[in-house]
């Protein structure tokens, strides 16, 4: 099934992952894919990908001193965007197979 909003989602994805920011595009792409994430960020990024509703203030606070507000925000948004894309693709594939 074709996603009528694919071009908009792709533009959003490119801007968030490759646009200007405090974190590197490589770090944002890694968070979006949940691959090659720095070890200290891995638990948070994995949690966002698998069970985002369980992320706590403490999860973020542990990394705040190292990464700061802007970089943390960018990593969290990138991870959430990557997780949402995986779910969208799975849903569209399920509709295609139905």
Question: Which role does the model predict for each range below?
Answer:
Residues 1-98:
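Hydrophobic alpha-helical segments
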């Amino acid at each position: 099934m074709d996603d009528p909003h694919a071009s908009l989602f792709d533009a959003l994805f490119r801007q968030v992952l490759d646009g200007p920011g405090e974190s590197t595009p490589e770090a944002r792409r890694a968070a979006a894919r949940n691959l090659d994430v720095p070890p200290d960020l891995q638990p948070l990024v994995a949690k966002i990908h698998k069970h985002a509703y369980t992320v706590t203030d403490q999860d973020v606070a542990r990394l705040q001193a190292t990464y700061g507000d802007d970089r943390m925000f960018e990593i969290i948004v990138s991870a959430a965007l990557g997780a949402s894309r995986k779910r969208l693709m799975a849903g569209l594939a399920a509709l295609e197979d139905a």
